[in-house]
Amino acid sequence: MPVYCKSQCGNRAVLRRPKTGDALCKECFFAAFEAEIHHTISSNQLFQPGQKIAVAASGGKDSTVLAHVLKLLNEKHNYGLDLVLLSIDEGISGYRDDSLETVKQNRDDYQMSLKILSYEELYGWTMDRIVAQIGRSNNCTFCGVFRRQALDRGAKLLQVDSIATGHNADDIAETVLMNILRGDTARLRRCTDIRTGGGEDSIPRVKPLKYSYEKDIVMYAHYKKLVYFSTECVFAPNAYRGHARAFLKDLEKVRPSVIMDIIYSGEQLRFKDTVKKPVRGTCSRCGFVSSQQPCKACVLLEGLNRGLPKLGIGKKSKGDRMIAEQNRELDLRERANLVKNDF
């Protein structure tokens, strides 16, 4: 006996939506998925008419679906946005060079301008060279720190009002778990925020796919026949996030709603007033947003350039302490010179 679409459109169902379990035809699934993202955008006032938005594009399923849906909703609901693609080339052979070809295809398909920035031009290093020096351990720390700052640099260069990232519900639930397991209350406070950053010295980031399940995104890309790059990063198997992801998938088998349950729990967490919250400022070296002096990117880069890459690893690394001590010495010298010049 055929199963018909739950929306009562009269068409036969061709899929069962992972997030809700509803049997839907393709068109009704598309409409429900897009309407959900539109509701997320409008209810959280993520954009304003006339803004220029950089879509962080990696060529993967999330950023490809995000670019496609934002273009569609921008035209359908008259958001009045100027959408551009911003990609970061980490310098990972056999992975990023191939995925960037997909990004270029997205640029042509969606008729958006594209800006590509590389670690090589920004930092003088590629991830291939970094991994060759430090090994397979902690490479995601370097890549994550450099990538976040590279997006800020690219956004500033493009003079955009905000950056839209493809973080989905699964990503956010994984991050909540990771921060709980690591006892990282500072990141736990903000990891469920749909908008982060902003202010005088930083460009805000928004997550339009915050409530979209990864399985829904894959299904949408499949039935829409979108072109995306599906190969996992060659360095990803060693990432700590993989353990949180595996744990989450096991929980999901027992309780399908666990992804949204974790996100809602993260949103409702309350912290004691005695828990110190990092103060976001500007790095004294590179001038970009940071909650420490100097910023983590500068600390890691300092270690690489000095041939001591592990200086910057850890919550309060040896590199942090060393550079802070250097800064104190420089400050004392400057003060001594000022006093000397006064006489």
From Swiss-Prot:
<dbReference type="GO" id="GO:0005739">
    <property type="term" value="C:mitochondrion"/>
</dbReference>
<dbReference type="GO" id="GO:0002098">
    <property type="term" value="P:tRNA wobble uridine modification"/>
</dbReference>
<comment type="function">
    <text>Plays a central role in 2-thiolation of mcm(5)S(2)U at tRNA wobble positions of tRNA(Lys), tRNA(Glu) and tRNA(Gln). Directly binds tRNAs and probably acts by catalyzing adenylation of tRNAs, an intermediate required for 2-thiolation. It is unclear whether it acts as a sulfurtransferase that transfers sulfur from thiocarboxylated URM1 onto the uridine of tRNAs at wobble position.</text>
</comment>
<dbReference type="GO" id="GO:0032447">
    <property type="term" value="P:protein urmylation"/>
</dbReference>
<dbReference type="InterPro" id="IPR054306">
    <property type="entry name" value="TtuA-like_LIM_N"/>
</dbReference>
<protein>
    <recommendedName>
        <fullName>Cytoplasmic tRNA 2-thiolation protein 1</fullName>
        <ecNumber>2.7.7.-</ecNumber>
    </recommendedName>
</protein>
<keyword id="KW-0819">tRNA processing</keyword>
<keyword id="KW-0963">Cytoplasm</keyword>
<dbReference type="Pfam" id="PF22082">
    <property type="entry name" value="TtuA_LIM_N"/>
</dbReference>
<dbReference type="GO" id="GO:0002144">
    <property type="term" value="C:cytosolic tRNA wobble base thiouridylase complex"/>
</dbReference>
<dbReference type="InterPro" id="IPR011063">
    <property type="entry name" value="TilS/TtcA_N"/>
</dbReference>
<comment type="similarity">
    <text>Belongs to the TtcA family. CTU1/NCS6/ATPBD3 subfamily.</text>
</comment>
<keyword id="KW-0808">Transferase</keyword>
<dbReference type="GO" id="GO:0005829">
    <property type="term" value="C:cytosol"/>
</dbReference>
<dbReference type="GO" id="GO:0002143">
    <property type="term" value="P:tRNA wobble position uridine thiolation"/>
</dbReference>
<dbReference type="InterPro" id="IPR032442">
    <property type="entry name" value="CTU1_C"/>
</dbReference>
<keyword id="KW-0820">tRNA-binding</keyword>
<dbReference type="InterPro" id="IPR035107">
    <property type="entry name" value="tRNA_thiolation_TtcA_Ctu1"/>
</dbReference>
<dbReference type="InterPro" id="IPR056369">
    <property type="entry name" value="CTU1-like_ATP-bd"/>
</dbReference>
<dbReference type="InterPro" id="IPR020554">
    <property type="entry name" value="UPF0021_CS"/>
</dbReference>
<dbReference type="InterPro" id="IPR014729">
    <property type="entry name" value="Rossmann-like_a/b/a_fold"/>
</dbReference>
<dbReference type="Pfam" id="PF16503">
    <property type="entry name" value="zn-ribbon_14"/>
</dbReference>
<comment type="pathway">
    <text>tRNA modification; 5-methoxycarbonylmethyl-2-thiouridine-tRNA biosynthesis.</text>
</comment>
<dbReference type="GO" id="GO:0016779">
    <property type="term" value="F:nucleotidyltransferase activity"/>
</dbReference>
<dbReference type="GO" id="GO:0034227">
    <property type="term" value="P:tRNA thio-modification"/>
</dbReference>
<dbReference type="GO" id="GO:0000049">
    <property type="term" value="F:tRNA binding"/>
</dbReference>
<dbReference type="InterPro" id="IPR000541">
    <property type="entry name" value="Ncs6/Tuc1/Ctu1"/>
</dbReference>
<dbReference type="Pfam" id="PF01171">
    <property type="entry name" value="ATP_bind_3"/>
</dbReference>
<keyword id="KW-0694">RNA-binding</keyword>
